[in-house]
């Protein structure tokens, strides 16, 4: 769990870490090939789409080759994306780790074009499951008597009068959420830091 996952994947796919990280996060959050190329600073191209009856922007040759190499080493990413899409098409929702149902917006017209949000299925599952863990951690912290201040994404902030004691309790509460409640096969690491303010100033 302490490995640099982006470097591990970069080495495995035989590409640089920066594009590996961009692709990892981009695919997890529903980015298509065009947006990935833009994020990587790679050229795109325009091709005519028979299905859409117009020219559309797609990855250029360099971007296509990079994505093809990535997927050749990690075919499960496309499979996972497709599984989430198929689930949304059939049930109209995705289930998180805790079993919550996250519904997706139906296709809608945006600037004269029909847009489907099925590609966001994996993103919903990732972010929704992350929220499950954080919520469980919040409940644990509250029950343990910690003075909760606010949360930022997967970060829980508290006010402490006994730093050493509360650091230990906070770490335990989050560890309980990660390891005991959801029993993840790959454990998540927990970092606890202390500062005079949220910005650390």
Predicted region positions:
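Conserved catalytic core of nucleotide polymerization and phosphodiester-bond processing enzymes
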Residues: 1-201
